[in-house]
């Protein structure tokens, strides 16, 4: 009985995320940069949040770029997640010091609907502004993925999503 409530929440959450994804892809007048802070031991919540949006963006003619520090995306996972295998590009083993610069370059080109990069440290104001400008110029979305371990969870900020949007400022 208790889990049924969670199952109901997950489906409504997924439905809400799908609606946000539709609105986001229909409103293509500006770029977006968001930071997603998540617990490494609970990756499913991040997938529930991002997959509907990534699936919707996969319908565009542009690529999706994943800048991963160590992990390599498996073809099976990409296909099982409903992402277009022919539009997903990955650069792995990327040094964290090059991630922001690579994201800026990729976002600016306009060749990618979304650029996803992993960073352990917070962005500086200058880095964030540079990413926002690049996303706007390329009419793309950028996600900064910031994993936190369960042990450091008590000392760091709670898992959450930072949405930087001019709609709220």
From Swiss-Prot:
Site description Essential for degradation by Lon protease, residues in chain: 169
- Annotated region FtsZ binding: the residues are 106-112
Q: Which InterPro entries does the protein's record reference? A: Cell_div_suppressor_SulA (IPR004596), P-loop_NTPase (IPR027417), SulA_CellDiv_inhibitor (IPR050356), SulA_enterobact (IPR047696)
Question: PTM per UniProt?
Answer: Is rapidly cleaved and degraded by the Lon protease once DNA damage is repaired.
Q: Where is this region: Lon protease binding?
A: 162-169
Q: Which Pfam families match?
A: SulA
BP-aspect Gene Ontology terms = division septum assembly; DNA repair; negative regulation of cell division; SOS response
Question: Which branch of life, at top level?
Answer: Bacteria
Q: Which UniProt keywords apply?
A: Cell cycle, Cell division, DNA damage, Septation, SOS response
Question: Per the entry, what induces it?
Answer: By DNA damage, as part of the SOS response.
Listed SUPFAM superfamilies: P-loop containing nucleoside triphosphate hydrolases
Function according to Swiss-Prot or TrEMBL: Component of the SOS system and an inhibitor of cell division. Accumulation of SulA causes rapid cessation of cell division and the appearance of long, non-septate filaments. In the presence of GTP, binds a polymerization-competent form of FtsZ in a 1:1 ratio, thus inhibiting FtsZ polymerization and therefore preventing it from participating in the assembly of the Z ring. This mechanism prevents the premature segregation of damaged DNA to daughter cells during cell division.
Cite the HAMAP family for this sequence: SulA
Q: Which NCBIfam families match?
A: PRK10595.1, SOS_SulA_coli
Sequence similarity: Belongs to the SulA family.
Quaternary assembly: Interacts with FtsZ.
Q: What protein does this entry describe?
A: Cell division inhibitor SulA
Q: Which organism is it from?
A: Escherichia coli O1:K1 / APEC
């Amino acid at each position: 009985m208790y889990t049924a409530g969670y199952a109901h929440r997950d489906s409504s959450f997924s439905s809400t995320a799908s609606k946000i994804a539709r609105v986001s892809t229909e409103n293509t007048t500006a770029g977006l940069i968001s930071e997603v802070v998540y617990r490494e031991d609970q990756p499913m919540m991040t997938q529930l949040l991002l997959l509907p949006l990534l699936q919707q963006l996969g319908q565009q003619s542009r690529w999706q770029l994943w800048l991963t520090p160590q992990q390599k995306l498996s073809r099976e996972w990409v296909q099982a997640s409903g992402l277009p295998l022919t539009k997903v590009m990955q650069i792995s083993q990327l040094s964290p010091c090059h991630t922001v610069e690579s994201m800026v370059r990729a976002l600016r080109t306009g060749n990618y609907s979304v650029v996803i990069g992993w960073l352990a440290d917070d962005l500086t104001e200058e880095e964030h502004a540079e990413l926002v400008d690049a996303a706007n110029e390329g009419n793309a979305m950028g996600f900064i993925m910031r994993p936190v371990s369960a042990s450091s969870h008590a000392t760091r900020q709670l898992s959450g999503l930072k949405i930087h949007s001019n709609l709220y400022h």
